[in-house]
């Protein structure tokens, strides 16, 4: 795909001045020149044009906010002075896999005052004797060359650093919020307590009901006993009267 078409595709209906990152890797440049990029990409901070067969940076637009520029695996052999003119705030530049052969070509990067990291891996210049010391002497503003500083300490991965920062923030949030599940357990305990209270109330209601039932039954039994006693007394009275009447009846019969 041609570079101009690729740019239109990557925009995704955005205006050029709204874009901060643009990746054009593996598309085809026009005769080794940049095409489709212009000064309207003024908010661009990251631009990648790896393996697009570039031979020249002459048509690179002014990108004053650009911080990172990926130009690996192209055919660039010189003309690096344009970078300081149009991208003065570059901090990272990757020129690995290009046709850079000597220190004179790299000297043009001295005017990139904010440059901290430079990659020249797989360029012929890396075959020079004392290559690393020479580059650090020439470009004293840089900290990392081909991923390592002068003491061979590896450059940190900015994305990993951001992830670690996010993890630390998350840990702090968790610490402030308390151990996970703590509040849930408290809620469960509260719920359990309320359930227990309800159970005790139900049990008390049940006991009081049973006690009332027993008392009522006892009252009924007492009433029954009293009624039975009255009936027995009435029966005894009737029998007594009968016994009294019998002698009288006998006396009457004798008189007869």
UniProtKB/Swiss-Prot annotation:
Positions of LRR repeats: 43-64, 65-87, 89-110
Q: Where is this region: Disordered?
A: 147-256
Which Gene3D superfamilies does the record cross-reference, listed alphabetically? Answer: Ribonuclease Inhibitor
- Chief localization class? cytoplasm
Q: Extract one GO cellular component term from the record.
A: cytoplasm
Q: Which family does it belong to?
A: Belongs to the ANP32 family.
Protein's UniProt name: Acidic leucine-rich nuclear phosphoprotein 32 family member E
Taxonomic source organism: Gallus gallus
Gene transcribed to yield this protein: ANP32E
């Amino acid at each position: 795909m041609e570079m101009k078409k690729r740019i239109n595709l990557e925009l995704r209906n955005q205006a050029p001045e709204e874009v901060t990152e643009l990746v054009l890797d593996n598309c085809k440049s026009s005769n080794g020149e940049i095409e489709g990029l212009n000064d309207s990409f003024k908010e661009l901070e990251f631009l990648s044009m790896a393996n697009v067969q570039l031979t020249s940076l002459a048509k690179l637009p002014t990108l004053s906010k650009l911080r990172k520029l990926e130009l690996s695996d192209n055919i660039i052999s010189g003309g690096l002075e344009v970078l300081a003119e149009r991208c003065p705030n570059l901090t990272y530049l990757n020129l690995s896999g290009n046709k850079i052969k000597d220190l004179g070509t790299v000297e043009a990067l001295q005017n990139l005052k904010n440059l901290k990291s430079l990659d020249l891996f797989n360029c012929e210049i890396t075959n020079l004797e004392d290559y690393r010391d020479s580059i650090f002497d020439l470009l004293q503003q840089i900290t990392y060359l081909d991923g390592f500083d002068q003491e061979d300490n590896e450059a940190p991965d900015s994305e990993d650093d951001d992830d670690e920062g996010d993890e630390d923030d998350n840990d702090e949030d968790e610490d402030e919020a308390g151990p996970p599940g703590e509040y849930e357990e408290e809620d469960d305990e509260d719920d359990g307590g309320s359930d227990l209270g309800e159970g005790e109330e139900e049990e008390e209601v049940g006991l009081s009901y049973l006690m009332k039932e027993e008392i009522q039954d006892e009252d009924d039994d007492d009433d029954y006993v009293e009624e039975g006693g009255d009936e027995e007394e009435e029966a005894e009275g009737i029998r007594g009267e009968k016994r009294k009447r019998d002698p009288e009846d006998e006396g009457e019969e004798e008189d007869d």
